[in-house]
Amino acid sequence: MKKYADYTLPSFFGRVRPSNIWTRGVYYEGLIALYSIYPREDYYSYTYDWANFHKWGMRNGNTTRNADDQCCGQVYIDLYNMCPSDPNMIRNIKASIDMVVNTPQVNDWDWIDAIQMAMPIYAKFGKMTGEQKYYDKMWDLYSYTRNTEGEAGMYNAKEGLWWRDQDFDPPYKEPNGKNCYWSR
């Protein structure tokens, strides 16, 4: 991880960062995780500057239910937990997650990546606040994705693997007649 961050970090300085969706969110998840075990100030500063540049917000605002938009919230929460002096750091992501928590809808995660993009946010808020509602909603969203999304859920219990989304669950098969699974 260190070699990757050291190699790419300078290549992003001075560039406009127009996106606060999953494509950059997952990079910053990794960078802040690296910072937690290898605390170089430039890793923290670069991550903080990115979050601040986006005003600690998400693409499509606080009413988004889209996990791709919410992914950046994982990093915002991590930064806040390192220095919990400014509640504005998590205000937007909390508003978005609270909106989801306070509705009965559970079919938001209709592609497998959504579990990685949004699920940790619910766990982080559950731990931070001590409120069970975050864990309950996380479980409801996860269970629906696993067991119901598409025809019969996106998880193949027999093979222990996940289909990408409902377009790839049975009866879909690859040209070789096998199931098509998703991985990164």
What kind of feature is each model-predicted range?
Residues 1-184:
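Glycan-recognition and catalytic cores of secretory/periplasmic carbohydrate-active enzymes
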